[in-house]
Amino acid sequence: MAQLYFYYSAMNAGKSTALLQSSYNYQERGMRTVVYTAEIDDRFGAGKVSSRIGLSSPAKLFNQNSSLFDEIRAEHEQQAIHCVLVDECQFLTRQQVYELSEVVDQLDIPVLCYGLRTDFRGELFIGSQYLLAWSDKLVELKTICFCGRKASMVLRLDQAGRPYNEGEQVVIGGNERYVSVCRKHYKEALQVGSLTAIQERHRHD
């Protein structure tokens, strides 16, 4: 039986690398995969999933209006799909998560979703909220804070490198705008108003 998987983490935990490896594993066995990524995130070029270690794959784009079940069913009828993989799945809508569950339940195609659990305010993304609620399997991909603890929070930094937790939920950026940290140092950085000061303090402890 196919299942719906949600692989979640903070930033820079290797989600895209894990997705590309999973896709490769299917293809190596002669199976066909379809990869989706969010239209909104084009840091590495539109229409592809890229990892920080240099791997990449062509990808179909989804936005809030995409009818994923209809798209996948139509393509599956043309040529069998053995696995659907979705990068940046935090940007899915509630309806799209439901449609992906239908891909699993009605078409018997496994769906592997990769994305962030929470935003820079510590709030769940809509896509992540419903994947946490409806997935068959939840898998945390771990990355670490500068202190060595598990990093479960994402700090947003302004142009001067100062952390803040107000404003729009979605501002696309790479390392220059977001940093993964543990909960303790997330709270401390916001209280002090400087991630650098917290890092310096930690080095001297």
From Swiss-Prot:
Write down the EC number.
Answer: 2.7.1.21
Q: Give the catalytic activity.
A: thymidine + ATP = dTMP + ADP + H(+)
* MF terms in GO: ATP binding; thymidine kinase activity; zinc ion binding
The protein's superkingdom reads Bacteria
- Where does the protein principally reside? cytoplasm
Q: Does the keyword Phosphoprotein apply?
A: no
Family from the record: Belongs to the thymidine kinase family.
In its UniProt entry, what is this protein called?
Answer: Thymidine kinase
Q: Which organism is it from?
A: Escherichia coli O157:H7
Upper lineage is:
Bacteria, Pseudomonadati, Pseudomonadota, Gammaproteobacteria, Enterobacterales
Point out the gene that encodes the protein.
tdk
